[in-house]
Amino acid sequence: MKIDGRPYRTIFPEADGDAVMVIDQTRLPFAFELKRLTNLDDAAVAIRTMVVRGAPLIGVTAAYGMALAMRQDASEAGIERASATLAATRPTAINLRWALDRMAAVLRRAPESAREALAFTEAAAIADEDVASCRAIGEHGAKILSEIAAKKDGPVNVLTHCNAGWLATVDWGTALAPIYVAHDAGVPVHVFVDETRPRNQGAALTAFELNAHGVPHTVIADNAGGHLMQHGQVDVCIVGSDRTTASGDVCNKIGTYLKALAATDNRIPFYAALPFSTIDWTLSDGVRDIPIEERDAREVTHLTGRTDDGAFATVAVVSPGSPVANPAFDVTPARLVTGIITERGVCDASEDGLAGLYPERRRAA
């Protein structure tokens, strides 16, 4: 995608190969800055502190983190150490584990002397595959939006939660990819953007993306979605996913489940958009089995923003001494999901639906 007319990916190696560059998402939407990753620890910290975030991008960053680690230690012990360090950064996104397993398998087949170069080649391949997958998700999802547009006057009103756009992937995004493809094809689209507390990833990141692409949108408070649905102002919901089970349960940013409940109650289609690397074929009960990351209470108790004079300030918003819980994700059961949009097409949120698109994955599970 483009920033000020210049194309960017969220992660890419420097031209001289000395470092891997990422967009520092903690600085958005008020500053666009690139950050250099030069070693394993840099990559791990970037994932843990959410300089990079979004399940697909976390996976690609982990792949490049493995490549950077091979510069210091390409031994079997080095592979194990790098994989363990990166795997410990964030527990919910399955793309992280998928990318690490793929990298380790490729590296172990090569002699130690060849592992550094091979690691960068494989990480680049994973990044390119992510771009292709997200573009395909966009094409399949745009057909849904086009069908809705053909049946109504005015724009298709899409509600989305958190950020599942190009900032969450290498390019294009998952939930936002259909919106970009449809918009570029001339389909009138308007997006309701949940602010997505506590980190405000919708207000800060999704709105930033949509602004940059020229897509009409409105930022709304997290609790406004149900009201809009009741009054016929939402045509479809599209969200991303950090882990989806083989049975179609969708784990996504906290608050997604509530949107799905409201959509079901108001007979509004609710889709999850995700690549194959987000599917965990080993799990069937997402509510029971998906580990949910518990993040720092300070994300809830404090807000950081830009003041009217251009300075940045962090302020407390919670009564001092009150206990805080901060689960980062929730699970939407498959029964509430209209369909899953993947790079291979759209399917029912069910074991049979997913297996129909990925028969080889089901056999391999």
From Swiss-Prot:
Pathway info: Amino-acid biosynthesis; L-methionine biosynthesis via salvage pathway; L-methionine from S-methyl-5-thio-alpha-D-ribose 1-phosphate: step 1/6
Keyword Aminoacyl-tRNA synthetase recorded: no
BP term (GO), one: L-methionine salvage from methylthioadenosine
This protein's record includes keyword Amino-acid biosynthesis: yes
Cysteines paired by S-S bonds: none
Keyword list, A-Z: Amino-acid biosynthesis, Isomerase, Methionine biosynthesis
Site feature (Transition state stabilizer) residues: 162
Enzyme's top EC category: isomerase
Chain positions recorded as substrate binding sites: 53-55, 90, 201, 252-253
Entry's EC annotation: 5.3.1.23
InterPro entries: IF-2B-related, IF-M1Pi, IF_2B-like_C, Initiation_fac_2B_a/b/d, M1Pi_N, NagB/RpiA_transferase-like
Pfam families (alphabetical): IF-2B
Catalytic site positions: 242
Single Gene Ontology MF annotation: S-methyl-5-thioribose-1-phosphate isomerase activity
Catalysed reactions listed for this entry: 5-(methylsulfanyl)-alpha-D-ribose 1-phosphate = 5-(methylsulfanyl)-D-ribulose 1-phosphate
Family to which the UniProt record says this protein belongs: Belongs to the eIF-2B alpha/beta/delta subunits family. MtnA subfamily.
Biological function: Catalyzes the interconversion of methylthioribose-1-phosphate (MTR-1-P) into methylthioribulose-1-phosphate (MTRu-1-P).
Name the UniProt record assigns to this protein: Methylthioribose-1-phosphate isomerase
Species whose genome carries this gene: Methylorubrum extorquens (strain CM4 / NCIMB 13688)
